[in-house]
Every structure is written in C-alpha cells, then in structure tokens.
Regions:
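A short, aliphatic-rich alpha-helical micro-motif
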Residues: 4-5
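C-terminal and late-domain segments of enzyme folds
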Residues: 9, 55-135
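Class I SAM-dependent methyltransferase SAM-binding "motif I" and its flanking Rossmann-like core
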Residues: 12-88
Length: 135
C-alpha cells in the first residue's frame, strides 16, 4: 500500500471499535501502523478507541465481536462523548463505573477534548471536560 506510506495523516472516524479492529487486522493495516512513525493518526470516536487495549463491554455493539479487545497500540482506554447531549448513558458516573471494570489507565473525554500521543508522551488537549482514571 504505497499510498498509505505517502500519507501525512490518516483520519479514522467513528463506528464500532471492535469491528474496526477486526478489519485492521484482516487487512494487515495493524502491522503497517508501527512502520509509519511520521504519519499522524487522527481518530474520532471509535477511530481513537481502536488504538486502545480494551473498550469495555459498554461500547461493544458489533454482534460478532469475540470480546472488547482492540489493538493496544496505546496503553490506556477511552470513554468518548462524555456528557454528550441526547446520550444519557455517557455521564461521568457511567464513565467511572466503566473505568473500574476496564482494568487499566483510562480517560473519559467530551467532544472538545483530544488526547495526543507522541512517542511515549501522552497529553490531553481540551477546552471541555475530561477525567483521567488511574487504576
């Protein structure tokens, strides 16, 4: 996939993170990501969640998903769309319950928040609401 190596940025939008992880494995994309250290991965919703080790059962929607495991390229999990209007299940209380079950470091972030990972440096960039869980 030469075009992939020529890309400066990959924008990966939402959906189901387990489905996305499945097809990233099937297509071989998961093996290409580490060979592209200069390429910026911009994940939106499931596009970010797919890079984490787990998404938690709360976010698994794909019926064929064997579990809640995703790619584990970063070492933390993400609860997206915190306090999103019209999504009554995405509260901070739900995020705390989710984080207690995830078994590792995690972040709950709203739609005005991003997490950057450069090498081993993780930073939160936000004009909104977020919380870090260290479990």
């Amino acid at each position: 996939m030469p075009w992939l190596h020529d890309a400066d940025v990959l924008l990966v939008d939402g959906g189901d993170a387990t489905y996305l992880a499945h097809w990233m494995r099937e297509s071989g994309l998961v093996h290409l990501v580490p060979s592209m250290p200069e390429t910026v991965w911009v994940g939106v919703s499931a596009g970010s969640m797919v890079m984490t080790p787990r998404i938690g059962d709360y976010f698994v929607e794909w019926a064929a998903a064997p579990n809640d495991r995703t790619l584990g390229i970063v070492d933390f999990s993400i609860f997206p769309h915190l306090d999103y209007p019209g999504w009554p299940g995405n509260t901070l209380a739900k995020a705390r319950t989710w984080a207690a079950k995830i078994g590792g470091p995690a972040y709950a972030i709203d739609d005005q928040t991003a997490i950057t990972v450069v090498d081993d440096l993780v930073e939160v960039v936000s004009e909104g609401h977020w919380e870090q869980f260290r479990l």
